[in-house]
Amino acid sequence: MEAVILNSGKGSRMGNITSMQPKCLTKISDKETILSRQLNMLCELGIKDIVITTGYLKQKIIDYCETLKLPLNIKYVNNNDYESTNYIYSLYCARDIIKDKDIILMHGDLVFEYSVLEDMILRDKSCMKISTTSKLPDKDFKAVVEGGIVKKVGINYFDKAYEAQPLYKLNKTDWNIWLKRICEYCVNGKITCYAENALNDITDLCQIESYDAKNKLCAEVDTEEDLSIIKEQLYEINNRLVYMCFSTDVIHSGHIAIIKRAQQLGKVMVGVLSDEAIASYKRFPLLPFSERKVMFENIKGVYKVVEQNTLSYKNNIEKYRPDIVVHGDDWRNGIQKGIRKEVINILKEYGGELREFPYSYDKKYIATERKLTAELAMPDMRRSRLRKLLNLKRMVTALEAHSGLTGLIVEKTMVEDEGGIRQFDAIWISSLCDSTAKGKPDIELVDMTSRFRTIDDICEVTTKPIIFDGDTGGLVEHFIYTVRSLERMGVSMIIIEDKKGLKKN
């Protein structure tokens, strides 16, 4: 996909601001101009091929783009007749390098939110930005929309029309149809009208859907008054609170990428799940909360890091009232589906928004998680974890297992409960069930070596702490050796009892 930015005009309505520079170089904040904002967003969203049409003070645009040092492939097409033509002619000048491609088409004076551009890029079909909530302008673009399809675009349409901006995502087929009509207009001398005049002739031949940005920022800077309004809106956007939550022990490139995307939406607050919250639904954390918190505090652009004590977002959303909550789209299905629903309902109460980014199913991330899980299964890690859980939760839940398969049931079983997720904390290896599985009426008839094989089978496929039912413990003289063997295998606890006679199954 390629982006086409129209920057040939003078922007004379801006007065002294554009007397010495093109309008696209107008500063809209301390750190960015209109053009730098557009290019940075395109770069963040993976669009590296850019075509910029120039005209008025063209060299200033070229020199400025070089100072940005962005990893972009920018081509410049100059419209020498910029003073006597409209942007339809600039597109005609660029026709040979912009045809036969999917494109993002925008005017060079457009300022928009990151989420507006992102949403349009992610759509499968061609689309144009409209707003069903904005007031119809008197002199600017409006789009006539029928059944979600743009039928007419211009300044004189009012019936069945919505406020519109010249920001398009166009698939190759639709764009080629429009570009062909643009070329026909220019060949016939129609070079002072809008390119949308040509579009209006062929809307029955292409399908351009309306993308409703509603109240999100997407506006042209035509006057100094427009500039003042947009600066205020950008200040509000940059100070919006964006909330994310993490449970990871290791930060990889996928986490950094999603944080950087979230930073485009406002100030990022990271919620770090407490050790207890993670242990309640996932593997036990390798790093304690305090270290994971510091880890996120040292990521550039993270505004604040707070603790999230439960898997449910309810308490933190109600406390901090973020404007936007960001999460991967993997929770739309599965065990966290109910938590997602709760987040949506709470945000609706005060007008908050949920933004979901595509989850990264990269093989290297999956391999990293498997490596961490394997470390948890190591005897030293497994053995010490029961004590940590008891210190953390005071009470743990265990379920009996007597084979690799039943061990997997204990390991994987999770249930949603009141906005959270519950799972078993430990595996109980029962002497009664172990002997029954081996067809023996009493555990005293089962050799300890045989029981050790059961533990090996379970350890091979699980990571949770193991509590071993040692029955009587056998001979007192042998018990110390039994305990040492169990410790080497990673067993966290052995329970013995005093009994007389056989306990028949």
Task: Give names to the regions the model predicted.
Residues M1-A3, E163-N239, D362:
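Conserved alpha/beta core of the MobA/IspD/sugar-nucleotide pyrophosphorylase nucleotidyltransferase superfamily
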Residues L376-D417:
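N-terminal amphipathic alpha-helix/helix-capping segment at the start of soluble metabolic enzymes
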